[in-house]
A protein has these predicted regions:
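Helix-start/capping segments and mature chain N-termini
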Residues: 1-146
């Protein structure tokens, strides 16, 4: 997790702006530690989003994602997943990650990507993620993700 916190009370948090400084710095720090992505918490300690992605969790086939009010940018792929699946928006704290079997991130360039580890928690299961990826590939006609 990033040590930088998202400001859930700032209106700029919810819009794409040209200020990617925090995301760039945190993504570089993560890469230096051998990580692909970093996840931000807000001032209340709730999980928000990745530096370049939205984050989802799966428990017993049910999909969960942080609420917009946690301080995240509502990405295009997040919207796609929310539209095609029954997704519950809720507050998610790092200490509750053990209740989930799967985790994935989304963005328009990488699509739907599984997360193997977030902090101390490992996510080995991929059933729901594979179904989502296949559905997305079908919609895209294999153009984006052969």
């Amino acid at each position: 997790f990033s040590e930088v916190r998202r400001n859930e009370s700032s209106p700029f948090t919810y819009h794409k702006t040209l200020n990617y400084g925090e995301c760039i710095l945190e993504k570089r720090r993560a890469a230096a530690r051998g990580l692909d992505e970093v996840v931000f918490l807000n001032g209340r300690g709730e999980i928000c989003e990745g530096a370049v992605s939205n984050v989802f969790f799966v428990r017993k086939g049910e999909i969960f994602t942080p609420k917009l009010s946690c301080g995240l940018l509502p990405g295009i792929m997040r919207g796609y997943v929310m539209e095609c699946c029954d997704v519950e928006e809720r507050k998610i704290f790092p200490d509750s990650l053990g209740e989930f079997e799967e985790c994935f991130v989304t963005n328009s360039l990488m699509g739907i990507m599984p997360v193997s580890r977030l902090g101390a928690y490992e996510f080995a299961k991929r059933d729901t993620i594979r179904r989502l990826q296949e559905k997305y590939r079908t919609i895209c006609g294999g153009v984006l993700f052969p």
